[in-house]
Amino acid sequence: MDFNLLTDSEARSPALSLSDSGTPQHDHSCKGQEHSDTEKSQQNQTDDSNPEDGILKKKQRRQRTHFTSQQLQELEATFQRNRYPDMSTREEIAVWTNLTEARVRVWFKNRRAKWRKRERNQQAELCKNSFGAQFNGLMQPYDDMYSGYSYNNWATKGLATSPLSAKSFQFFNSMNVSPLSSQPMFSPPNSIASMTMTSSMVPSAVTGVPGSSLNNLGNINNLNSPSLTSAVSASACPYASTASPYMYRDTCNSSLASLRLKAKQHANFTYPAVQTPASNLSPCQYAVDRPV
């Protein structure tokens, strides 16, 4: 009967185990654990190295290109001639300036953005300087010009008040023009008032002019009556000037004045007395004087 004897070193090692037949066999489970531990350590090392590589790549992307004065001069000269160079032109510039084509392309892109921004700012400044001062001089703020007008204050204003006459407008003052003319409006002409006459002064025997029409025309004296003046002032616009309004002098009033002047001159004019034949002559004498 054969017995498998183990040495002391084999008996102490946990990797060996006895089979049913008694032959020593190596334990593979311990070896698998050792391999898994080594693989995990290698993966951890690779994971630690990956973030470092990513950081290095990001730092490389964020690097700024420092151009020399000669390179900038060449790039600026090309940009003045052509703001959108094609691929071949960019490659030529890259050869001249000792740069890569990608850096030249990025430089032109940034330079165009800077140029567009400067153009917008210049246009805004030009519009502000050219038109802003003119509009500010002509147009005053709304609250300053119309501070006297507010909502729901029409009932407090009297009919005789004149806020426009007391209100001064800077635009009209600069032009020496008042918003409402100081010349009286709707006032009868003084020439008509001075030449008006009563119906008793107008002769009824004026040829071509009936006396009734002259009497009707004589009623123009009533224009200066107090009742008419009060009526005009009461019906006047509450925002008009306190001065009497102005009336347009048409040709009808002037012709009326000339007609009255002619009538007055005709009344003062006296015809020479006509010598009538002597009434003491008899009819016989008339017959004798007549030629046969």
UniProtKB/Swiss-Prot annotation:
A motif (Nuclear localization signal) lies at residues 260-264. GO terms for molecular function: DNA-binding transcription factor activity, RNA polymerase II-specific; RNA polymerase II cis-regulatory region sequence-specific DNA binding. GO terms for biological process: anatomical structure morphogenesis; regulation of transcription by RNA polymerase II. Keywords: Developmental protein, DNA-binding, Homeobox, Nucleus, Transcription, Transcription regulation. Residues 60-119 bind DNA. Pfam families: Homeodomain, OAR. One of its GO terms (cellular component) is nucleus. A motif (OAR) lies at residues 254-267. SUPFAM superfamilies: Homeodomain-like. CDD domains: homeodomain. Residues 25-40 have a biased composition (Basic and acidic residues). Gene3D superfamilies: Homeodomain-like. InterPro entries: HD (IPR001356), Homeobox_CS (IPR017970), Homeobox_Pitx/unc30 (IPR016233), Homeodomain-like_sf (IPR009057), OAR_dom (IPR003654). Its main location: nucleus. It is found in: Nucleus. Belongs to the paired homeobox family. Bicoid subfamily. This is Pituitary homeobox 3. It comes from Xenopus laevis. The lineage of its organism: Eukaryota, Metazoa, Chordata, Craniata, Vertebrata. The gene is pitx3.
